[in-house]
Swiss-Prot record:
The gene is tuf1. This is Elongation factor Tu. Mg(2+) binds at residue 26. HAMAP family: EF_Tu_B (MF_00118_B). Residues 136-139 are annotated as: G4. Residues 10-204 form the tr-type G domain. InterPro entries: EF-Tu_GTP-bd (IPR041709), EF-Tu_GTPase (IPR050055), EFTu-like_2 (IPR004161), EFTU_2 (IPR033720), G_TR_CS (IPR031157), P-loop_NTPase (IPR027417), Small_GTP-bd (IPR005225), T_Tr_GTP-bd_dom (IPR000795). GO terms for cellular component: cytosol. It holds the Pfam family GTP_EFTU_D3. Keywords: Cytoplasm, Elongation factor, GTP-binding, Hydrolase, Magnesium, Metal-binding, Nucleotide-binding, Protein biosynthesis.
Length: 394
């Protein structure tokens, strides 16, 4: 089978289904691909294809995830669905599947359940920016008032976690009936697709964001000055641009006097490229791995933050024993480890391998960070956890 050509013409948006176990996330995923393929063309994915999710390893963590793709007339969607609750937790914390928006699936027969709440909270913590709700199994509820009540409950729950519960789209449908080809329910899947198109804004591309380059290596070239190398994380840097060197110590400024790639001089370095940047007036000893080169004013160094964390299980190669208050592992940000002290939440005495929780971290050196930045927790070079900066404190 020939590979279909990847069409760059349409905006590419990443979404995923979240919600309580057995509320119909995978059935909905199958229904979306099936109904959209029938309506707009494209390939359908069967339920058992999606449900039989392959295991992937992201930063040493085993996650089962299914990836499907579908098109609306204006967009191309990449959609992730996870079989188990633990997979969602890991996926959202590691950022293995970054979501521009999420489809929260709530069964009308049950209303919001514990994992519904947990997924909304996780979405808030890890920075899923937009939620669209699909109320599933509405064919099994005859009472119109009951449907309204469930919708109200879901909206209130979303508002509680600072999503705009009153304004976001809620579609009442039945994934199973749509999958079986019943027209009135197929129409609800189209309505959901239209809600994704109109409610989730087109994501800002990495290249359009402010320039940032995590420094991997520093060289001194006699007669030319100091060169830092790394992969541009976002934005574009042009020869002549002023930059800040942020993290580890006090922020300094410099000017990029040259950009090289594969020993060739270029005018610019763009997101995704491995480059060397020549810095004017910067000494070799002033720069180190772990700092970032960034557009002035675009990012600040911080030492204290609230983290949402998943602690690896023993089977994943994590710790075999719990940790307690006073735990001081290394936090690996981008290119380097920084030691940090962990402050456990009130009432939590110990943390077991396989747990997920939030706690406050105080680093011994500042790191350039924004909320949403991912990190690994390591002990002597071995990964024992994964986390995301949920809230910067200082």
């Amino acid at each position: 089978m020939a590979k279909a050509k990847f069409e760059r013409t349409k905006p590419h948006v990443n979404v995923g289904t979240i919600g309580h176990v057995d509320h119909g996330k995978t059935t909905l995923t199958a229904a979306i691909t099936t109904v959209l393929a029938k309506t707009y063309g494209g390939a359908a994915s069967a339920f058992d294809q999606i449900d039989n999710a392959p295991e992937e390893r992201e930063r040493g963590i085993t996650i089962s995830t299914s990836h499907v793709e579908y098109d609306t007339p204006t967009r191309h969607y990449a959609h992730v669905d996870c079989p188990g609750h633990a997979d969602y937790v890991k996926n959202m914390i590691t950022g293995a599947a970054q979501m521009d928006g999420a489809i929260l699936v709530v069964a009308a027969t049950d209303g919001p359940m514990p994992q519904t709440r947990e997924h909304i909270l996780l979405g808030r913590q890890v920075g899923v920016p937009f939620m669209v709700v699909f109320m599933n199994k509405c064919d099994m509820v005859d009472d119109e008032e009951l449907l309204e009540l469930v919708e109200m409950e879901v909206r209130e729950l979303l508002s509680e976690y600072e999503f705009p519960g009153d304004d976001l789209p809620v579609i009442q449908g039945s994934a199973l009936k749509a999958l079986e080809g019943e027209e009135q329910w197929e129409a609800k899947i189209i309505e959901l697709a239209e809600a994704l198109d109109s409610y989730i804004p087109e994501p800002e591309r990495d290249i359009d964001k402010p320039f940032l380059l995590p420094i991997e290596d520093v060289f001194s070239i006699s007669g030319r000055g100091t060169v830092v190398t790394g992969r541009v994380e976002r934005g574009i840097v042009n020869t002549g641009d002023a930059v800040e060197i942020v993290g580890m110590k006090d922020t300094t400024t410099s000017t990029v006097t040259g950009v090289e790639m594969f020993r060739k001089l270029l005018d610019e370095g763009r997101a995704g490229e491995n480059i060397g940047a020549l810095l004017r007036g910067t000494k070799r000893e002033d720069v180190e791995r772990g700092q970032v080169l960034a557009k002035p004013g675009s990012i600040n160094p911080h030492t204290q933050f609230e983290a949402e964390v998943y602690v690896l299980s023993k089977d994943e190669g994590g710790r075999h024993t719990p940790f307690f208050k006073g735990y001081r592992p290394q936090f690996y940000f981008r290119t380097t480890d920084v030691t940090g002290a962990v402050e456990l939440p009130e009432g939590v005495e110990m943390v077991m391998p396989g747990d997920n929780l939030k706690f406050v971290v105080e680093l011994i050196a500042p790191i350039a960070m924004d909320e949403g930045l991912r990190f690994a927790i390591r002990e002597g070079g071995r990964t024992v956890g994964a986390g995301v900066v949920a809230k910067i404190i200082a």
